[in-house]
Amino acid sequence: MLDTPGHVDFSAEMERTLQVLDYAILVISATDGVQGHTRTLWRLLKHYNVPTFIFVNKMDMQGTDAEKVQAELKSELSDGCVDFSSQDLFEELAMCSEPLLDEFMESGELTDAHIAQAVAQREVFPCFYGSALKLDRVDTLIQGLSRFMCERNYPDDFFCPRIQDRQG
C-alpha cells in the first residue's frame, strides 16, 4: 500500500508512484466534489491502467449529498462509477460490462469474482461513502477491497532471487 500526497504541489512524486500500483483508492471530499486535480489524477490512473476504488470522504459534514456526488462522479469521471451501497447495485453493475449483463440476465445475481474482474479491467469503479475521521463506513470500504480485488499474478522474473554469500 502506498499513501501518496493528494496536493497539486506533489503531482510529480505522486505520478511516479502510480506506475507501480496494482490498485488505487481515490479519495474525494464530499464537500468539494470532483476538482481539477481530481480529473488530473483520474487521467493518470487511466493512463497507467490502474484499477480504482473511490472513497467519498467527509460525509459527516453538513450539507453533503451522496446522490449529488455520485451523479458528479458519473458525469465527470466515468459511467462505471457505481455506488456499492445502492439498492440497485446489480442492475447498475450490469450496465457497465457485457459479461456482467449476461450473468445478471441469466441468474439475477453477480458473483464477487466477476465484479472483481470488471474492476480489474477498469469497467467498474466501486464508490464507497463515509468519514475517515470518524471511521464511519471505512470498514465497508475495507470489505469492498477484500471482496473485489483480484490477486495479481507476476512473472517469475519479477522477483529478485535470494543470493547468499559464503557466510550464509
Question: Where are these predicted regions, by residue range?
Answer:
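Structural and coupling elements of P-loop NTPases
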Residues: 1-168
